């Protein structure tokens, strides 16, 4: 049974994006449409949404039916969206990184360790599947991926077990992979499922999620209007580090001309952002209690100067 989709940190997203009537916004990760719909309901603005998952098109068509020319949908991954956007510029851009609740709740997509299904994990349905990777990768490569993208302490033990098991029979379902991981770690009461980190790591690797994020950030300046805002919600320490470092490297620096002068802004042509979140915003305890998927979320925002 699918759980209702609850957009993560929705109020914070609206606060920092600060939508206004007549302005245009880019929702880079449409998913179930929570952010797009909230923006459209907030004021008389325009939203363009992106997603590489063909399964979300029906939801996009529903929003298009309700909001007509105020909403457009483009089937593409956000890392390669620039040509398809045809030189459009936006007053605000939002990214909600990671997997959507819809993808997690459909067993056939192969994202969830809670539901047995084909071991797929591809957001677009194209390219290398998790099953192919799990059954063909070298033990060292498996361990490296699980450690790097999952922060999994037991990565080598898990990789070794995967190689042992696949010699006897192909690992072709999420249930089989989850059981292998659990057998290596074991359950601890009150802790997250032992398979969480491994599934996250494989999903990030299969979909090149970090590479796509870096590619988008490298080009986002070209589609963000002056004073436009960029809001990013991440769910993994590596994602957050990429966003944090990008904001820092491209932000204006306050510089005091002398110890007697007031602090002044020295603008460098290479510095085009002003950070508007002093530190990463995190969900409230209330939101986490209502939506456990929000527990690891972090939101950062900046403005183009």
From Swiss-Prot:
EC number from the UniProt entry: 2.1.1.199
Query: Is Methyltransferase given among the entry's keywords?
Result: yes
Q: Which reaction does it catalyse?
A: cytidine(1402) in 16S rRNA + S-adenosyl-L-methionine = N(4)-methylcytidine(1402) in 16S rRNA + S-adenosyl-L-homocysteine + H(+)
**Keywords noted in UniProt:** Cytoplasm, Methyltransferase, rRNA processing, S-adenosyl-L-methionine, Transferase
User: Which InterPro entries does the record associate with it?
Assistant: RsmH, SAM-dep_MeTrfase_MraW_recog, SAM-dependent_MTases_sf
Residues at which S-adenosyl-L-methionine binds: 33-35, 51, 78, 96, 103
The processes (GO biological process) annotated in the record are: rRNA base methylation
Q: What GO annotations for molecular function exist for this entry?
A: rRNA (cytosine-N4-)-methyltransferase activity
Question: What does the UniProt function comment say about this protein?
Answer: Specifically methylates the N4 position of cytidine in position 1402 (C1402) of 16S rRNA.
What NCBIfam families does the record point to? 16S rRNA (cytosine(1402)-N(4))-methyltransferase RsmH
Q: Which family does it belong to?
A: Belongs to the methyltransferase superfamily. RsmH family.
Task: Report the protein name in the record.
Answer: Ribosomal RNA small subunit methyltransferase H
**In which organism is this protein found?**
Rickettsia bellii (strain RML369-C)
